[in-house]
């Protein structure tokens, strides 16, 4: 039994912009689970299509019940191969990704097609499919459920990361993360408190000076 996912997303940027952002996605505030990316092969075909293969390393925190099934020294990083085919003439990009380790625990295969949105030529549509499978006897269903939930969570991060990079490339101010916003608010609160303290000291000093002047009179 294989868990299947089908989803569709829209980025409000042109295909050319999304294509450029695709190769510059990392790092971004939403991709902290992506540790490394390396291009291992690239070529242009006679019909002017760009073929690429990348190797990505991502963190892979297992659920506690899964950690009991594997030795403590099992790597918590996942190596992922990504093949992509870019057709600039038809403005399509197709990617295939799959993990090459931890395959006994779980295999996640993904296929994405990036194309011009049919309703708005200035937008880009992403059609995403994924297959989650496990060969672990007795717990394969639980592993697949976990894998599908993790995949959906990562899709959300991927889209937010895309939007962040697109905003930077287009010269807009990217939306700040909650951590950044909280940090700025904390710093601003400190500055406000410090300013209030200094003002209170100043007022106290002035009041003391006036009191002394009255006593002298």
From Swiss-Prot:
GO terms for biological process: apoptotic process; negative regulation of apoptotic process; negative regulation of mitochondrial membrane potential; negative regulation of release of cytochrome c from mitochondria; positive regulation of cellular respiration; positive regulation of endopeptidase activity; positive regulation of phospholipid transport; positive regulation of T cell apoptotic process. Transmembrane segments: none annotated. Pfam families: PRELI (PF04707). The keyword Transit peptide applies. Involved in the modulation of the mitochondrial apoptotic pathway by ensuring the accumulation of cardiolipin (CL) in mitochondrial membranes. In vitro, the TRIAP1:PRELID1 complex mediates the transfer of phosphatidic acid (PA) between liposomes and probably functions as a PA transporter across the mitochondrion intermembrane space to provide PA for CL synthesis in the inner membrane. Regulates the mitochondrial apoptotic pathway in primary Th cells. Regulates Th cell differentiation by down-regulating STAT6 thereby reducing IL-4-induced Th2 cell number. Forms a complex with TRIAP1 in the mitochondrion intermembrane space. Interacts with OPA1 and AIFM1. This is PRELI domain-containing protein 1, mitochondrial. It comes from Mus musculus.
């Amino acid at each position: 039994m294989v868990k299947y996912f089908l989803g569709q997303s829209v980025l409000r940027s042109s295909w050319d912009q999304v294509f450029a952002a695709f190769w510059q996605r990392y790092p971004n505030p939403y991709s902290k689970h992506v540790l490394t990316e390396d291009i291992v092969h690239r070529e242009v075909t006679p019909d002017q299509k760009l073929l690429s293969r990348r190797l990505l390393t991502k963190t892979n925190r297992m659920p506690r019940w899964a950690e009991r099934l594997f030795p403590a020294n099992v790597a918590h990083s996942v190596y992922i191969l990504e093949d992509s085919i870019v057709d600039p003439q038809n403005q399509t990009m197709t990617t295939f990704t799959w993990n090459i380790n931890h395959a006994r625990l779980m295999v996640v295969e993904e296929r994405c097609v990036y194309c011009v949105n049919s309703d708005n030529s200035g937008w880009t549509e992403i059609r995403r499919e994924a297959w989650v499978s496990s060969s672990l006897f007795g717990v394969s269903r639980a592993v697949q459920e976990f894998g599908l939930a993790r995949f959906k969570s990562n899709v959300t991060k991927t889209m937010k990361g895309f939007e962040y990079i697109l905003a930077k490339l287009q010269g807009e101010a990217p939306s700040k993360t909650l951590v950044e916003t909280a940090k700025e608010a904390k710093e601003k609160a400190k500055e406000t408190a410090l300013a209030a303290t200094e003002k209170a000291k100043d007022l106290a000093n002035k009041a003391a000076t006036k009191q002394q002047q009255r006593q002298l009179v």
